[in-house]
C-alpha cells in the first residue's frame, strides 16, 4: 500500500476517474444554493441532486468530485472517537444513467488494489452487501475477492424518503488484531459492533429504484436511468494509508494540533487524554471553511451551528490553559494544509480571522454570564437542600451558553453537587429527534420525471427579440406527450423562443401565442428549464395547438423591460456593495421581479444608514453616467481574466455570457439586460434587513416605482410638517426634535415626582414591621401606577435596615402584581413568590434577593398578605 499525503490521495482519486471518462465537478460551496432541504452540503452527492432526480441532464453522465462537507448531528462525539468530524471531505464517483454495478465494482477494486494506484493489500479488504443483491456478491468474486471477505448486511439498502434508492456495498480495511483486543473478528462487521479494527473507507450505492414510502420495498419501481453514487472519506483513507492510529494523526490535522501545542504549552499524546486538541483541530477547520463560504455565527440555523462549534472549541482551549483569544490564529494553518485544492481559505484569511476573533471576544463575555447562571443554579440547589444539578439545567448551559458537559460537571462536583446525566441525555435526544425529523421531511432526493427527461428536441432562446415565429416541437398534457391539445394547461417546447425561462434570479417572461390568423391560442404563464435545458412554456390553452405547426410567440414587452431595469440595477448594487462594505458582501440570492428587486448578500452586521446612503448614491451615479451595457460569449477562463464575478453555486458550461456595464461591473450572467444604464432611470433602496445568520437583504425599486417611493416619502414628510407646524419641509426635523426634547423633559419630571411620591409613601409602608420564625418582614398592599414603582419601593427599602423581607402587592388595572425582596440567606425570594403567587391566580419567580409575579384575582390580596408569615 502506498503511503500518500492527503493531497496526493485526492489527486490520485480524481486522476483515476478522469482516466475512466469522468469529468471533475469542482467542490461546491458549503452553503446550499437553491436547496432549502439542506442546512449544509453534507455529502458528495448533495450537489448533484438535480442530476439524480432527472430535473437536469449533465453534459457528461460520468462525474467525479472531492466535496467539502459538514455534518453536525454528532457534534458531541467529535474528539471522543477516532473518526467523527464536523467538516470532512468526501471523494466520489457518479454515473447518471451510464455505467452501473459491474463497472462500479470492478473500477473501484482496480483503484484500491492496482500497483499503479493505491495498491491496497487485497487480503486486508472486506466488503459488505445487501443479502438480496447477489449480483454485487458475484461481481466481487469475479474481481478475485475471497467469499470469506464478503459479509451480508440487511441494512445495506440506501434510501432517504421518496426518490432514488437501492442496495449498497461497503468496503472496509482490516487494521488487524491489535485493534481487536477481544479477538471478535468478523462479528464486528456482521453485527455492526462499534470498533477500530474494520474501517469503512468507501460506500458504493447502486441507485436503481424510485423509493415510495407508501409501498413495500419489493414494490419499488425501477428508475428510468440507473445511477451510481459513491463516497469515500478522505480523512479515513489518509489515516489508513499514512498508518495513523486515528484520523487526527494525519497530515490533515496534525499541523493544527502542533500549533495548539505551542499556544497551550501542553503536549498532544495520541494514547492519552487528547480530546481538547481534537475538538479544536476539527472545529477550526469547519469554521474556517464555512465562514469562507459565506456563513457567519449567529443565533439560528447554520449560524447557530457555527457559534456552537466556536464556543465548544474555546471552552476546550480553556481546558488546555488557553484563556485568551486563540482560534483565529489557527486559520492560516488550516489554509496552508488545504491550499492545493481549496485556496479560498488563504484568499479570505483576513475576513475569516476577523469574524472568528470577534466571536471569541463576544463569547468571553458570554462565559461570564454562563458562569453566573451556573452559580445561581448551585445557590438555588443549596437553598432547596438538593444535591443534584438537573439535566434540563445542564442542557441549557450546554445549548445556550456553550458550556461542555464536562466543564459543568467539573465545576458542580468541585462545589459538592452531582450531575443528572440521564436528564441531560434525554434533553439532548429531544433536540436530535427534532433535527432528524426535519431531515426526513425535507431530505428526499426527489422523484425522477421520465416524461420531462425524455425531451431531446432542440430549442433556442433568442435574446434580442420580443416576438418571433417558431415551430411547436413538443406538447405535454397530463404528464404525457401528445400531438395536439385544445384546452386546459399544457407544457410546450418550440424550436426557438423569445420567452426567457426563469433562472439566475430573473423571473420568467409571460405573454401570448398566436396562430397564423393572429388569434391568441394560448397564454404563457410561466417558463422553466426542462431537464435537457430547453425552455418549457407553461400555457393556458385557449384554442387548438398541434405539433409541427408554426406559431407567433410574443412576450409582454413592458413587463420584460421593467424586469430588465431591476436586473441591471442588481448588478450595479452588487458592485456598489463591494465598494462600500467590502468584497465579502457576495450574492447569496436574488429576485428580479417586475415591481422590485431583492438582493441577498453575506455580511455580519446591519448595513448602517450612512452606508445605505453611499450605496444608493453610487448606483444612481452609474445610472446617470449612461454606461453602455455589452454582452460577450466566451469561455470561463477568459471571462475571469476580464474580471467577471462568478457567483457561488452557479454551474457554468463551456460557453458563458459576460455582462459588462461600462467599466463599473462585470459579471457572468445568463439573464436579459438593458442596453444602457440610463434606461433604469432611478434607483431607491426601500428596505434593508437580516434574513438569517450572516445574511442581509436589500429590497429596492427602479424607474417609475422609485419615483413613486420618493413621492410617497415626500407626502408623508409634508403631513408631518403640517402636524408639527413647520413653516417649510426642511424645518420639520428640527421641529420634531424640539417636541421630542420637550417630551423627554416632561417624562423626566414626571418620573422624579413619582419617585418622591413613592419615597413619601414608603415611609408609611416601612413602619409596619412584623416578625415570624425569627424573620422580620413587611407585607403591604400599595397603590401604584405600574410594576416599576414596586421596584422603586424595593430600592428604597434596601437603603436602610427596615426588615429582612419585603412583600408588596398592587392591583394595577385587572392585574395583580407581587414583589418579594430578601436581604437574608434564610429566605429565597424566588421560592417564596412561587408559594404566594398562586393565591392570586398567578405565577412568577426570580433570584434569591428579588422576585416578581403576576396574578389575576385581586379579591385574594388580603389572603396573600396573611400567608406571608407562614412562608418566610
Curated annotation (Swiss-Prot):
The keyword Flavoprotein does not apply. Coiled coil: none annotated. Its EC number is 6.1.1.7. PROSITE patterns: AA_TRNA_LIGASE_II_ALA (PS50860). Consists of three domains; the N-terminal catalytic domain, the editing domain and the C-terminal C-Ala domain. The editing domain removes incorrectly charged amino acids, while the C-Ala domain, along with tRNA(Ala), serves as a bridge to cooperatively bring together the editing and aminoacylation centers thus stimulating deacylation of misacylated tRNAs. It comes from Streptococcus pyogenes serotype M28 (strain MGAS6180). Its cofactor is Zn(2+). Belongs to the class-II aminoacyl-tRNA synthetase family. One of its GO terms (biological process) is alanyl-tRNA aminoacylation. This is Alanine--tRNA ligase. Binds 1 zinc ion per subunit. The gene is alaS. Catalyzes the attachment of alanine to tRNA(Ala) in a two-step reaction: alanine is first activated by ATP to form Ala-AMP and then transferred to the acceptor end of tRNA(Ala). Also edits incorrectly charged Ser-tRNA(Ala) and Gly-tRNA(Ala) via its editing domain.
Amino acid at each position: 500500500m502506498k503511503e500518500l499525503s492527503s493531497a496526493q490521495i485526492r489527486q490520485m482519486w480524481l486522476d483515476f476517474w478522469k482516466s475512466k471518462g469522468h469529468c471533475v465537478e469542482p467542490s461546491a460551496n458549503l452553503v446550499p444554493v437553491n436547496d432549502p432541504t439542506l442546512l449544509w452540503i453534507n455529502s458528495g452527492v448533495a450537489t448533484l441532486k438535480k442530476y439524480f432526480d432527472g430535473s437536469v441532464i449533465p453534459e457528461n453522465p460520468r462525474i467525479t468530485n472531492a466535496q467539502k462537507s459538514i455534518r453536525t448531528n454528532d457534534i458531541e462525539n467529535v474528539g471522543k472517537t477516532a473518526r467523527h468530524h464536523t467538516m470532512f471531505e468526501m471523494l466520489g464517483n457518479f454515473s447518471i444513467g451510464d455505467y452501473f454495478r459491474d463497472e462500479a465494482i470492478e473500477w473501484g477494486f482496480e483503484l484500491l488494489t492496482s500497483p499503479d494506484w493505491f495498491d491496497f493489500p487485497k487480503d486486508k479488504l472486506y466488503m459488505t452487501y445487501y443479502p438480496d443483491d447477489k449480483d454485487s456478491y458475484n461481481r466481487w468474486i469475479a474481481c478475485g475477492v475471497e467469499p470469506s471477505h464478503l459479509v451480508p448486511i440487511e441494512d445495506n439498502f440506501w434510501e432517504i424518503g421518496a426518490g432514488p434508492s437501492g442496495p449498497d456495498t461497503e468496503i472496509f480495511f482490516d487494521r488487524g488484531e491489535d485493534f481487536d483486543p477481544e479477538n471478535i473478528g468478523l462479528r464486528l462487521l456482521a453485527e455492526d459492533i462499534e470498533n477500530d479494527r474494520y474501517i469503512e473507507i468507501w460506500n458504493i450505492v447502486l441507485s436503481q429504484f424510485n423509493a415510495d414510502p407508501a409501498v413495500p420495498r419489493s414494490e419499488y419501481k425501477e428508475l428510468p436511468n440507473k445511477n451510481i453514487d459513491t463516497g469515500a472519506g478522505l480523512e479515513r483513507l489518509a489515516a489508513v494509508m499514512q498508518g495513523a492510529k486515528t484520523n487526527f494523526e494525519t497530515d490533515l490535522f496534525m499541523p493544527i494540533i502542533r500549533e495548539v501545542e505551542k499556544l497551550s504549552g501542553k503536549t498532544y499524546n495520541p494514547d492519552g487524554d487528547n480530546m481538547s486538541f481534537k475538538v479544536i483541530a476539527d472545529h477550526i477547520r469547519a469554521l474556517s471553511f464555512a465562514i469562507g463560504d459565506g456563513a457567519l455565527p449567529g443565533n439560528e440555523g447554520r449560524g447557530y451551528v457555527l457559534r456552537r462549534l466556536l464556543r465548544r472549541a474555546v471552552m476546550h482551549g480553556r481546558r488546555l490553559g488557553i484563556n485568551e483569544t486563540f482560534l483565529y490564529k489557527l486559520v492560516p494553518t488550516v489554509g496552508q494544509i488545504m491550499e492545493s485544492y481549496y485556496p479560498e481559505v488563504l484568499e479570505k484569511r483576513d475576513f475569516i480571522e476577523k469574524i472568528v476573533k470577534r466571536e471569541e471576544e463576544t463569547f468571553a463575555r458570554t462565559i461570564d454570564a454562563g458562569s453566573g447562571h451556573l452559580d445561581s443554579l448551585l445557590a438555588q440547589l443549596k437553598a432547596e437542600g438538593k444535591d443534584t444539578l438537573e439535566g434540563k439545567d445542564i442542557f441549557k448551559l450546554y445549548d445556550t451558553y456553550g458550556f461542555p458537559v464536562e466543564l459543568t460537571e467539573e465545576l458542580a462536583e468541585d462545589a459538592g453537587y452531582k450531575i443528572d446525566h440521564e436528564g441531560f441525555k434525554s434533553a439532548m435526544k429531544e433536540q436530535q429527534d427534532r433535527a432528524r425529523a426535519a431531515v426526513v421531511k425535507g431530505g428526499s432526493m426527489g422523484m425522477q420525471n421520465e416524461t420531462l427527461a425524455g425531451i431531446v428536441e432542440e430549442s433556442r432562446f433568442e435574446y434580442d427579440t420580443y416576438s418571433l415565429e417558431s415551430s411547436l416541437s413538443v406538447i405535454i398534457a397530463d404528464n404525457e406527450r401528445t400531438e395536439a391539445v385544445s384546452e386546459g394547461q399544457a407544457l410546450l417546447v418550440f424550436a426557438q423562443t423569445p420567452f426567457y425561462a426563469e433562472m439566475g434570479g430573473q423571473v420568467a417572461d409571460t405573454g401570448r401565442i398566436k396562430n397564423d390568423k393572429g388569434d391568441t391560442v394560448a397564454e404563457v404563464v410561466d417558463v422553466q428549464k426542462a431537464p435537457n435545458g430547453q425552455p418549457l412554456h407553461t400555457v393556458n390553452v385557449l384554442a387548438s395547438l398541434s405539433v409541427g405547426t408554426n406559431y407567433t410567440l410574443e412576450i409582454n414587452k413592458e413587463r420584460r423591460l421593467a424586469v430588465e431595469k431591476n436586473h441591471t440595477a442588481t448588478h450595479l448594487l452588487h458592485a456598489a456593495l463591494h465598494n462600500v462594505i467590502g468584497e465579502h458582501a457576495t450574492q447569496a440570492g436574488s429576485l428580479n421581479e417586475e415591481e422590485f428587486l431583492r438582493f441577498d448578500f453575506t455580511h455580519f452586521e446591519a448595513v448602517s444608514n450612512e452606508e445605505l446612503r453611499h450605496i444608493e448614491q453610487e448606483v444612481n451615479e452609474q445610472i446617470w453616467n449612461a454606461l453602455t451595457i455589452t454582452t460577450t460569449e466566451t469561455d470561463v477562463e477568459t471571462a475571469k481574466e476580464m474580471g467577471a464575478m462568478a457567483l457561488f453555486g452557479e454551474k457554468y458550461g463551456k460557453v458563458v455570457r459576460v455582462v459588462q456595464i461600462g467599466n463599473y461591473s462585470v459579471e457572468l450572467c445568463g439573464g436579459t439586460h438593458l442596453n444602457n444604464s440610463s434606461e433604469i432611470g432611478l434607483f431607491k433602496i426601500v428596505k434593508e434587513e437580516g434574513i438569517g445568520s450572516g445574511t442581509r437583504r436589500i429590497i429596492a425599486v427602479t424607474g417609475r416605482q422609485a419615483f413613486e417611493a420618493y413621492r410617497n416619502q415626500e407626502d408623508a414628510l409634508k403631513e408631518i410638517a403640517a402636524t408639527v407646524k413647520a413653516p417649510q419641509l426642511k424645518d420639520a426635523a428640527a421641529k420634531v426634535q424640539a417636541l421630542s426634547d420637550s417630551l423627554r423633559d416632561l417624562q423626566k419630571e414626571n418620573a422624579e415626582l413619582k419617585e418622591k411620591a413613592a419615597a413619601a409613601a414608603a415611609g408609611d409602608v416601612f413602619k409596619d414591621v412584623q416578625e415570624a420564625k425569627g424573620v422580620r418582614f413587611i407585607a403591604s398592599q400599595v397603590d401604584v401606577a405600574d410594576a416599576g414603582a414596586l421596584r422603586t419601593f424595593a430600592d428604597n427599602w434596601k437603603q436602610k435596615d427596615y426588615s429582612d423581607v419585603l412583600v408588596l402587592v398592587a392591583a394595577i388595572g385587572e392585574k395583580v402584581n407581587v414583589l418579594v425582596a430578601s436581604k437574608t440567606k434564610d429566605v429565597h425570594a424566588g421560592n417564596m413568590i412561587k408559594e404566594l403567587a398562586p393565591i392570586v391566580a398567578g405565577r412568577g419567580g426570580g433570584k434569591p434577593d428579588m422576585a416578581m409575579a403576576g396574578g389575576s384575582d385581586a379579591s385574594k390580596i388580603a389572603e396573600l398578605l396573611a400567608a406571608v408569615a407562614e412562608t418566610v
